[in-house]
């Protein structure tokens, strides 16, 4: 997300085409920003061993100012066994801060519940039935029903009152988005890129320099 906020969505395509490199100047600058935040203690202690539940517990106990996560958390906060903070509307949502103001309304993300249909070794009847089923799953009526139990963002806009103020705020933010991309390695033809990059970034928390991580 930081790279998108610094350079816009073109950075994903440039990395995928090798016009830019993961150990190049632009990306090393992003790793350095991450390292600076780690060294300043923004992410707390033991970040490599801090899991989702620990993060949530710290937030709800007032030991963390914020948590960075996806829009599915709108539903999680509403459906959890302890909804005290949600009920009191003491949780808010905001954009990830931009690095270059030109990319203020650029975000990382994509549609939920995407589907594809394979025709491999399938009859015309099976393919037609699958198309009909997918059309039902992606219809506004179906998505409205899904949103009642799992309030989050979908590929179609819901037409019901979700009863979830966090989701309402998220939708208001997303309505202002100008561009978005999935996680950058998604666009790389190297299928191992995602794991390689995630694993390399962890070294920032163990003392590696930004350039070492890039290399």
Each PLM stretch: what is its role?
Residues 1-23, 35, 64:
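Extracytoplasmic/periplasmic solute-binding protein
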Residues 52, 69-74, 111-113:
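Beta->alpha turn/N-cap motifs
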Residues 71-87:
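A ligand-binding cleft/hinge motif common to bilobed small-molecule-binding domains
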Residues 46-60:
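Short helix-initiation/N-cap motifs at beta->coil->alpha
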Residues 109, 149-155, 159-160, 170-215:
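C-terminal capping/gating helix-and-loop segments adjacent to ligand/active sites or protein-protein/ligand interfaces
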Residues 17-48:
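Glycine-centered hinge/linker elements that transmit conformational signals in sensory
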Residues 61-70, 89:
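Alpha-to-beta junction loops
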Residues 40, 82-149:
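Extracytoplasmic/periplasmic substrate-recognition and gating elements
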